[in-house]
Amino acid sequence: MKHKLFFLILAGILMTGNALADNQIKSAMSAAPASVSANAKVIDWNFKTLREGNNGWTCLPDRPDTPGNDPWCVNEPWLNFLNAYVKKEKPTYTEIGFAYMLMGDTPVSNNDPYATEPTSKEDWVTDLGAHLMMLIPNTDMLKNISTDHLNGGPWIMWPDTPYAHIMLPLENRQ
């Protein structure tokens, strides 16, 4: 009887873990069009593989510890960027990077990659819906692009940092 109870508990734990992984995979896949996410690798925010992929894209689920719904689908340069960002190191990508965030984002500083508290309206990005992001290895090429997230079009987020990238909103913003 004790063995049956043990196996029932173990089976319940395993099913709960599988359901959590399934939810994370579904969340991650919502970040990009199905043409990208259907065959993408899916990892969690500890960079543990939840599902293998075969198209060069990697998707990550919404981060439950942040406000907003913010899953990502990224190519290899963005994966390099995210690994460096998490470790507070300089990214080493050498190719153009693309990232999809079709579900939106969490509120974030436009200037300070590690800010955790809201700042001024001119800095704090709160209403960002679906968007794409681009990395350019030579960030000197970004100098003539606006850094104003309220300009109505593309802008540079985190300018003058190793994490500078182009934000491309896909929805109207106020």
Annotate each PLM feature.
Residues 5-13:
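Sec-dependent N-terminal signal peptides
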Residues 1-2:
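N-terminal secretory signal peptides that target proteins for export/translocation
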Residues 22-174:
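Primary mode marks residue(s) on the alpha4-beta5-alpha5 output face of response regulator receiver
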